Amino acid sequence: VTGYDTEAEPVEATNLLYRDPALYDVIQSDSTGAGMCQTLIETHRPDARTLVDFGCGTGRDLEILAKRFECIGLDLQPGMVDYARQARPELDIRIGDMRTARLRRCMDVVTCMGNTLAYVHDNNEITQVFATFAAHARQGSLLILCSPVAPITGTELMTATVDTPSGPATVTIRHEWDLRTQINTMRRHWALPSGDEAQDEIRRRVIFPRELEQYAQRVGFGILDMTDSSRGSTLTGPTAYTVARYT
């Protein structure tokens, strides 16, 4: 396993959207993450007042959550944090590495959304991240994760049109799955409205449900629920929301 892939420069180099936070912000504008997060909090911890979000990106979801909770956001990438501070100056957003960050505050809710956890590839470093989650929790605190729990194994090309501020872009996507490392690689080719082209290679670690359960339990979190966007009784993936309570 190759280790933590979330050093700021490599991540920006391999993901067009991280190199262009404004474009990321537009493309993520229809994200349902904040709404799902609020629903899960209402269900499992309706009296929550404080929240920390690891991997907050441009702060789009945090902006919604901050209407209800006192929030702090952390992200590893200075470009994302700079953009977030300019676009949403009312938010408390900081540069931080979720393997080692310590705010010296315990929060009612700890979140790690948008596949952030999937950029940590090494088992020991995943353990470090869960220790960070626990360091910011007290008895009764919620942990809410959104991460891949099953691989995308189809190898056929997929093409989509993405609206950008300068017009529609065409993106072609191919997935690869390495079972030994549990890494799903997504390769994207962008044809931009300007006529320019860009390439992406995004590598995400799939942490299967029973693995997630074990990582959480080792640091004191008990799993309450795992659900995907279908909200059905059967978990199908490939991405799931995991809710756990600190005991």
Name every feature range the model reports, one short phrase each:
Residues 2-57:
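Conserved class I S-adenosyl-L-methionine
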Residues 59-100:
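Class I SAM-dependent methyltransferase SAM/SAH-binding core
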Residues 102-109:
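A short acidic, Gly/Pro-enriched loop at the edge of an enzyme's catalytic core
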Residues 112-114:
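A short beta-strand submotif of the Rossmann-like class I SAM-dependent methyltransferase core
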Residues 127-139:
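A short glycine-rich, Lys/Arg-flanked "PGG" loop and its adjoining helix->strand segment in the class I
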Residues 144-215:
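SAM-dependent methyltransferase
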Residues 211-247:
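C-terminal lobe and adjacent flexible extensions of AdoMet/dcAdoMet transferase-like proteins
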